[in-house]
């Protein structure tokens, strides 16, 4: 039986120095569950000390070889257009991999492109915001491709639902880098034995 987090539960998330190169210890209180399937869970959590919010993403895996963490390196997706992944923690007792991710309160691109929640009182104003969002999205793609040209990182599930944007288009970030495909041998990577991703996008 999977050990899911419950709302109100307190958990200490630790990124191991041996695996990541630096320590990070955060005492978290689970606030709200966002998503749950048989093998995955996503929670909104709060740092008890600072009040800062995070997304906590959990992958349950019976075969821990499926999650491979190479000690001397890590994935660092630092970009203003990509949601930040702070790192992962391997909980061997409960057979789960726990990822700490930047939290932002924005709508996904599919909702905004349908005109739901997008800023602007007139059609022209809304179109300007849509164009601004589209431009920032393209800039984000170009930015991360140029950053990782030497060690390419392929998203594999890029779709409107995996892009968050503010109603006025001032913030646009690509999300869901939990399952990235990396063409490199010296990086931190979670390996998948079977094909993942959304059909039509992956």
What do the predicted segments below correspond to?
Residues 94-108:
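Conserved short submotifs of the Hanks-type protein kinase catalytic core
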């Amino acid at each position: 039986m999977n050990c899911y987090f419950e709302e109100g539960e307190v958990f200490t998330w630790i990124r191991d120095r041996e695996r990541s190169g630096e320590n990070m210890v955060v005492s978290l209180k689970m606030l709200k569950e966002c998503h749950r399937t048989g093998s995955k869970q996503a929670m909104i959590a709060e740092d008890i000390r600072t009040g800062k919010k995070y997304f906590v993403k959990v992958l349950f895996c019976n075969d821990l070889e499926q999650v491979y963490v190479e000690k001397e390196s890590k994935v660092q997706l630092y970009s203003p257009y990509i949601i930040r992944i702070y790192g992962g923690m391997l909980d061997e007792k409960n057979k789960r991999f726990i990822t700490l991710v930047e939290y932002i309160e924005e709508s996904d691109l599919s909702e905004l492109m349908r005109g739901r929640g997008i800023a602007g009182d007139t059609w022209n104003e809304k179109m300007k915001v849509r164009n601004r969002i589209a431009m920032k999205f393209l800039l984000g793609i170009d930015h991360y491709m140029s950053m990782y040209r030497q060690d390419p990182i392929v998203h594999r599930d890029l779709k409107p639902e995996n892009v968050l944007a503010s109603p006025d288009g001032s913030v646009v970030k690509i999300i869901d880098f939990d399952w990235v495909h990396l063409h490199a041998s010296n990086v931190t990577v979670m390996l998948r034995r079977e094909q993942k991703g959304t059909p039509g996008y992956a």
